[in-house]
Amino acid sequence: MNRITYFKHSFFLICIILGCSSFAQNYIPFTPRFDQDVRGDIILIGNNILGPNNEAFNENSVYNHNVDMRYVDIDNDISTYSSSSADLEIPNPNCYQIIYAGLYWGAVTGGSESITEVQLKGPTGVYNDVTGTVIYNADDNITGNSFPYSCYADVTDIISNLENDLGTYTVANVSSAQGETSSFDPYNGTGYSAGWSLFIVYEDPTMPGKSITSFDGFSAISSSVNLDVPVSGFRTVPEPAPVRANFAFAALEGDKPIRNDLMLINDVNLSTIDRPANNFFNSSVTRLDATVVTNRNPNSTNTLGFDTGVMVVPNPNN
């Protein structure tokens, strides 16, 4: 791990999209996507795009394989087949500039539509066509009950050209299979889930400097074995200065009722009030202060297998 730094404070980000499989494996290594020293910060917003209907789903004891999953489509636009939204807010709205925006989307199993073509609408204007790069597409490469994919697109130019870049962002046409998989023959206990995350880096000259690095890749996790996901290439401050790190993520197939799914960084078990140590991936959208994000549509407490959020990484020995 490099230890070169130019700033007093260091900020570490990983943007992960995880899948599910009958066995654990690192399919696509995590490599840097964005790496820059910034006086500013990051924000991650997102939402799921599957559910029984367009309403918020708040039955927290339900597994997604027992739900007849259909596209959420909240935009009242007949040209889209799926859509959901989330609001972008910046703490100091009078002194900032967005310098990078990366859009991620994926599903446990893709639908019949294109997985690389989605649409993004900001607080002002109309939908913009977005063509993504495939991070991973299982297609027929693995066996089991799911064939996950994940895609990425740099949407900085789209957001930079908006008249107003704070407010509601809507992502449409994320492709996913649909149905209640527990009723399939043969039985499928995995279920379907899908969603999107928008990762924002912004400058604010009143804030301390940070080294911000984002990584993406694809790892499939299972309930039968632990999986180590190696990540390297980020910078930290030299000793003895304390390292302060945050961790951003997106994941698929983290049913809220399923316990004992853990996330550890350097053997430190991550947890917050809304992400317990024994149920880290719990179908929720959370922010840095560990609370659930409510300014999204639909505003579900159970996102039926989709997780995204940001949290502080505990570093008690430094």
Language-model segments: what does each one mean?
Residues P123-G189, P276-N318:
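Cysteine-clustered segments with highest specificity for TGF-beta superfamily mature ligands
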